[in-house]
Amino acid sequence: MDHEILNSYSRLNHLNVSRETFSDFENYISMIIEKNNKINLISEKTASKKAIIERHIIDSAQIIDFIDLKSNTTTDLGSGAGMPGIIVAIILKNMKNNMNVNLYEKSYHKSSFLKEVSEKLKLNTKVFQKNIFEIKDLETGTIMSRAFKPMPVVLDLVYENFFKFKNIIFFMGKSGKNVFENSKKKWVLEYTEKKSLTNEDSFLVNIKKIKKKL
């Protein structure tokens, strides 16, 4: 892999990511670009290789420190093109961690793409072409929510549909502070925050416990 490509991933150096993992990232990016010409996996604004690395790969990979690595599964809500779920699965493969990454995506074409990527890169994933709002009694370790639904909707979903989980990771954008503060009016949350690597106005929220306010 050339020096320029490795430099693109420099913000992930602290994760000690191997060259094999970078190679998996590169193959994944190629598959996204090729498939995006046929179906709308990601926005055209972020569909260049440089944008995919900076806006999607790095953004998704930065949550690995929040993943409960002792759990049997982690779950990506509304996985879309696979970010963060596929990215996390690639890193777990590099770590030789056999955790299952559950990818929920109701779109036939996107779920087919997720299966194709998982097979080609030999990832430990399970793809569910289902609407997660219709599934009850779910159990998992970490729940990941990136560009899925607003925080209040996801909190309600987790409260109603998951009987057991370790933590929920939210990717929050520019308006995230207001959304987060409004959510705390309805919920008692045990959480930590972390500044995003990709945007100074963005941040991550790692919620370990949720409880509805009376």
Annotate each language-model stretch with its function.
Residues 175-214:
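Active-site capping/gating segments
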Residues 131-133, 173-177:
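Short, polar loop motifs at secondary-structure junctions
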Residues 155-168:
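A short glycine-rich, Lys/Arg-flanked "PGG" loop and its adjoining helix->strand segment in the class I
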Residues 2-69, 75, 108-112, 116-123:
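Class I SAM-dependent transferase core
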Residues 61-140:
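Conserved SAM/SAH cofactor-binding pocket of Class I
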Residues 32, 172, 207:
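Residue-level signal for inorganic ion chemistry
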Residues 73, 142, 166-169:
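Short glycine-centered segments of the SAM/dcSAM-binding site in methyltransferase folds
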Residues 140-147:
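Short SAM/SAH-binding signature in class I
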